[in-house]
Amino acid sequence: MTSQRTRDRLIQRLYEEGLSNAHVLEVIRRTPRHLFVDEALAHRAYEDTALPIGHNQTISQPFMVARMSELLLADGPLDKVLEIGTGSGYQTAVLAQLVERVFSVERIQALQDRAKERLVELKLRNVVFRWGDGWEGWPALAPYNGIIVTAAAADVPQALLDQLAPGGRLVIPVGAGEVQQLMLIIREENGFSRHLLDTVRFVPLLNGPVI
């Protein structure tokens, strides 16, 4: 269930679906997704589907992890990325292998504690975690070259726009219903450009930390 052939099949499927960043695909290939799901679901870890991780949250499908990572890195390597929604830590682990530093915010402490353990196990040491409200971002360490949000916001949080560096890219699902639009926002010299992309399904971005 975790064989190299199984992972290769997943990467081939992602490539056929239009993903083309070789570095992103290689990181997806070598990141052990089965470590980020419950043991009972490990046999489904390399399916291209979202899976439950408890607390009414999910681990994103590999396609969406790769897609959002590609969008974030489209202008080249980044040195400082803010992730809103640590969740299982899978997207965090992928980002940690693609950028210099990751700052990850999660409102559910139990999820973040487990994610920390997984990243330690994988010897990924360039991630700093914060337990808190994702709507607020992490202003103390701003600005960020890239911001990625792994839950859907009804509107784009102003705090995240404020924390985006000039030329920086924000990738976020936007919408209040079960179906949302993936949006790419770029901070330009005189404001922000917004680009509506894929139709997506994400859990909602909620307020307030939870133990």
From Swiss-Prot:
GO molecular function: protein-L-isoaspartate (D-aspartate) O-methyltransferase activity
Keywords: Cytoplasm, Methyltransferase, S-adenosyl-L-methionine, Transferase
Catalysis: reaction(s): [protein]-L-isoaspartate + S-adenosyl-L-methionine = [protein]-L-isoaspartate alpha-methyl ester + S-adenosyl-L-homocysteine
Taxonomy, superkingdom: Bacteria
CDD domains for this protein: AdoMet_MTases (cd02440)
Gene Ontology CC terms: cytoplasm
Active site: S60
Gene3D superfamilies: Vaccinia Virus protein VP39
This protein's record includes keyword Magnesium: no
Major subcellular site: cytoplasm
Keyword Transferase: yes
Pfam families (UniProt xref): PCMT
Enzyme superclass (EC): transferase
Subcellular location field: Cytoplasm
EC number: 2.1.1.77
Xref: InterPro entries: PCMT, SAM-dependent_MTases_sf
GO BP of this protein: methylation; protein modification process; protein repair
NCBIfam families: pimt, PRK00312.1
Entry similarity comment: Belongs to the methyltransferase superfamily. L-isoaspartyl/D-aspartyl protein methyltransferase family.
Function: Catalyzes the methyl esterification of L-isoaspartyl residues in peptides and proteins that result from spontaneous decomposition of normal L-aspartyl and L-asparaginyl residues. It plays a role in the repair and/or degradation of damaged proteins.
Name of the protein this chain belongs to: Protein-L-isoaspartate O-methyltransferase
